[in-house]
Amino acid sequence: MRHRKSGRQLNRNSSHRQAMFKNMAGSLVKHEVIKTTLPKAKELRRVIEPLITMAKEDSVANRRLAFARTGDKEVVGKLFNELGPRYEARPGGYTRILKCGFRAGDNAPMAYVELVDRPVVEAEEEAVEATEE
Protein backbone atom coordinates (compact mmCIF):
# COMPACT_ATOMS: atom_id res chain seq x y z
CA MET A 1 0.00 0.00 0.00
CA ARG A 2 1.20 3.49 -0.71
CA HIS A 3 -0.61 5.27 2.09
CA ARG A 4 0.95 8.61 3.07
CA LYS A 5 3.65 8.43 0.40
CA SER A 6 4.18 11.89 -1.06
CA GLY A 7 5.56 12.69 -4.48
CA ARG A 8 5.33 10.99 -7.84
CA GLN A 9 7.54 8.08 -8.89
CA LEU A 10 7.39 8.95 -12.63
CA ASN A 11 8.63 5.41 -13.50
CA ARG A 12 12.18 6.28 -12.40
CA ASN A 13 14.43 5.27 -9.56
CA SER A 14 15.24 7.85 -6.90
CA SER A 15 18.65 8.89 -8.25
CA HIS A 16 17.24 9.35 -11.77
CA ARG A 17 14.37 11.45 -10.38
CA GLN A 18 16.76 13.56 -8.32
CA ALA A 19 19.06 14.18 -11.30
CA MET A 20 16.13 14.97 -13.58
CA PHE A 21 14.65 17.57 -11.22
CA LYS A 22 18.10 19.06 -10.60
CA ASN A 23 18.43 19.58 -14.38
CA MET A 24 14.85 20.82 -14.79
CA ALA A 25 15.22 23.31 -11.93
CA GLY A 26 18.41 24.66 -13.51
CA SER A 27 16.71 25.00 -16.89
CA LEU A 28 13.73 26.79 -15.37
CA VAL A 29 15.97 29.27 -13.56
CA LYS A 30 18.05 29.92 -16.70
CA HIS A 31 15.20 30.23 -19.22
CA GLU A 32 12.32 31.15 -16.86
CA VAL A 33 9.92 29.01 -18.92
CA ILE A 34 10.18 25.33 -19.92
CA LYS A 35 7.86 22.81 -21.58
CA THR A 36 7.47 19.38 -19.98
CA THR A 37 4.84 16.79 -19.14
CA LEU A 38 2.13 17.80 -16.68
CA PRO A 39 3.11 15.37 -13.86
CA LYS A 40 6.76 16.47 -14.09
CA ALA A 41 5.64 20.10 -14.05
CA LYS A 42 3.58 19.58 -10.91
CA GLU A 43 6.45 17.78 -9.21
CA LEU A 44 8.98 20.43 -10.31
CA ARG A 45 6.99 22.99 -8.31
CA ARG A 46 8.00 21.13 -5.13
CA VAL A 47 11.67 21.54 -6.07
CA ILE A 48 11.84 25.12 -7.37
CA GLU A 49 9.58 26.95 -4.89
CA PRO A 50 11.81 26.24 -1.83
CA LEU A 51 14.89 27.22 -3.87
CA ILE A 52 13.43 30.64 -4.68
CA THR A 53 12.31 31.12 -1.07
CA MET A 54 15.86 30.28 0.01
CA ALA A 55 17.23 32.81 -2.51
CA LYS A 56 15.34 35.66 -0.81
CA GLU A 57 17.89 35.58 2.02
CA ASP A 58 21.40 35.80 0.57
CA SER A 59 23.93 33.98 2.75
CA VAL A 60 26.87 31.69 2.14
CA ALA A 61 24.99 28.80 3.76
CA ASN A 62 21.95 29.31 1.51
CA ARG A 63 24.15 29.59 -1.58
CA ARG A 64 25.84 26.30 -0.69
CA LEU A 65 22.49 24.60 -0.15
CA ALA A 66 21.25 25.95 -3.50
CA PHE A 67 24.42 24.72 -5.22
CA ALA A 68 23.93 21.27 -3.69
CA ARG A 69 20.39 21.19 -5.10
CA THR A 70 21.18 22.58 -8.57
CA GLY A 71 24.85 21.80 -9.19
CA ASP A 72 25.41 24.92 -11.31
CA LYS A 73 27.15 28.15 -10.23
CA GLU A 74 25.42 30.16 -12.97
CA VAL A 75 22.00 29.04 -11.73
CA VAL A 76 22.89 29.87 -8.11
CA GLY A 77 24.07 33.32 -9.20
CA LYS A 78 20.82 34.04 -11.02
CA LEU A 79 18.76 32.71 -8.13
CA PHE A 80 20.36 34.99 -5.56
CA ASN A 81 21.08 38.06 -7.72
CA GLU A 82 17.89 38.23 -9.82
CA LEU A 83 15.11 35.95 -8.61
CA GLY A 84 15.53 36.43 -4.85
CA PRO A 85 15.18 40.24 -5.05
CA ARG A 86 12.40 39.95 -7.68
CA TYR A 87 10.20 37.82 -5.40
CA GLU A 88 11.15 39.54 -2.11
CA ALA A 89 7.57 40.71 -1.46
CA ARG A 90 5.81 37.57 -2.76
CA PRO A 91 5.06 34.96 -0.07
CA GLY A 92 5.30 31.87 -2.29
CA GLY A 93 3.60 30.86 -5.53
CA TYR A 94 6.51 31.75 -7.81
CA THR A 95 5.60 29.37 -10.64
CA ARG A 96 2.68 29.03 -13.03
CA ILE A 97 1.72 25.84 -14.86
CA LEU A 98 -0.10 26.27 -18.17
CA LYS A 99 -1.50 23.20 -19.91
CA CYS A 100 -0.63 23.15 -23.61
CA GLY A 101 -2.22 20.08 -25.16
CA PHE A 102 -0.83 16.62 -25.75
CA ARG A 103 2.46 15.33 -27.15
CA ALA A 104 2.25 13.94 -30.67
CA GLY A 105 4.14 10.67 -30.07
CA ASP A 106 2.45 9.26 -26.97
CA ASN A 107 -0.41 11.68 -26.25
CA ALA A 108 1.15 12.67 -22.91
CA PRO A 109 -0.37 15.83 -21.39
CA MET A 110 2.12 18.69 -21.80
CA ALA A 111 2.50 21.92 -19.84
CA TYR A 112 4.59 25.06 -19.68
CA VAL A 113 6.16 25.89 -16.33
CA GLU A 114 7.01 29.56 -16.02
CA LEU A 115 8.07 31.95 -13.31
CA VAL A 116 5.40 34.53 -12.52
CA ASP A 117 6.25 38.24 -12.93
CA ARG A 118 8.97 37.41 -15.44
CA PRO A 119 9.87 40.21 -17.84
CA VAL A 120 8.26 39.33 -21.17
CA VAL A 121 9.94 40.68 -24.29
CA GLU A 122 7.50 41.13 -27.15
CA ALA A 123 8.34 39.41 -30.45
CA GLU A 124 7.77 42.68 -32.32
CA GLU A 125 10.30 44.50 -30.13
CA GLU A 126 12.88 41.78 -30.81
CA ALA A 127 12.29 42.09 -34.56
CA VAL A 128 12.65 45.89 -34.43
CA GLU A 129 15.88 45.64 -32.43
CA ALA A 130 17.27 43.08 -34.88
CA THR A 131 16.55 45.32 -37.89
CA GLU A 132 18.10 48.38 -36.21
CA GLU A 133 21.43 46.57 -35.79
From Swiss-Prot:
- Record keywords, A-Z: Ribonucleoprotein, Ribosomal protein
Keyword Ribosomal protein carried by entry: yes
Gene Ontology biological process terms from the UniProt entry: translation
Is Cell membrane one of the keywords? no
NCBIfam families from the xrefs?
A: L17
The entry sums up its family as follows: Belongs to the bacterial ribosomal protein bL17 family.
**Protein name (Swiss-Prot/TrEMBL):** Large ribosomal subunit protein bL17
Which source organism does the UniProt entry give? Answer: Alteromonas mediterranea (strain DSM 17117 / CIP 110805 / LMG 28347 / Deep ecotype)
Source organism lineage?
Bacteria, Pseudomonadati, Pseudomonadota, Gammaproteobacteria, Alteromonadales
Gene designation per UniProt: rplQ
